[in-house]
């Protein structure tokens, strides 16, 4: 299966992505991570209004294979969470970069937040290196 990595996103080593629209960051999980997890059975996300700190776990995802913590690529305040994905986490694989987003965050310090994220091509190169 050919996985997509949209160029308008930034990625973390831990496979979360971020799409910025002004000071609003949409955060989700890459198609690679979703494929590796397999059948997703549970998704735990923060409440609206919760403050997130970059690098600190904000939730968890559980599949029949594994359970993994989720990490925000940016710090800020949760302004929305995807209730549909919480109720139907198995649908994350259908559209991870569209309807399968996880949370939306108002970024607290936009200038410094994306320094350690990867472009789509850098992320793909890292994944291909992991196969060796």
From Swiss-Prot:
Note whether ATP-binding occurs among the keywords: no
On whether Protease is a keyword of this UniProt record, the answer is no
Co-factor(s): (R)-lipoate
What is the cofactor note?
Binds 1 lipoyl cofactor covalently.
Q: Which biological process, per GO, is one annotated for this protein?
A: glycine decarboxylation via glycine cleavage system
This protein's source sits in the domain of life called Bacteria
| A Pfam family this chain is assigned to | GCV_H
Instruction: Using the record's annotations, give every residue carrying the modification N6-lipoyllysine.
Output: 65
**Keywords annotated in UniProt:** Lipoyl
| InterPro entries found in the cross-reference section | 2-oxoA_DH_lipoyl-BS, Biotin_lipoyl, GCV_H, GCV_H/Fam206, GCV_H_sub, Single_hybrid_motif
Where's the Lipoyl-binding domain? Answer: 24-106
Q: Which GO terms describe its cellular component?
A: cytosol; glycine cleavage complex
Q: What subunit structure does UniProt give?
A: The glycine cleavage system is composed of four proteins: P, T, L and H.
As for family, the record states: Belongs to the GcvH family.
Q: What does this protein do?
A: The glycine cleavage system catalyzes the degradation of glycine. The H protein shuttles the methylamine group of glycine from the P protein to the T protein.
Which named protein is this? Glycine cleavage system H protein
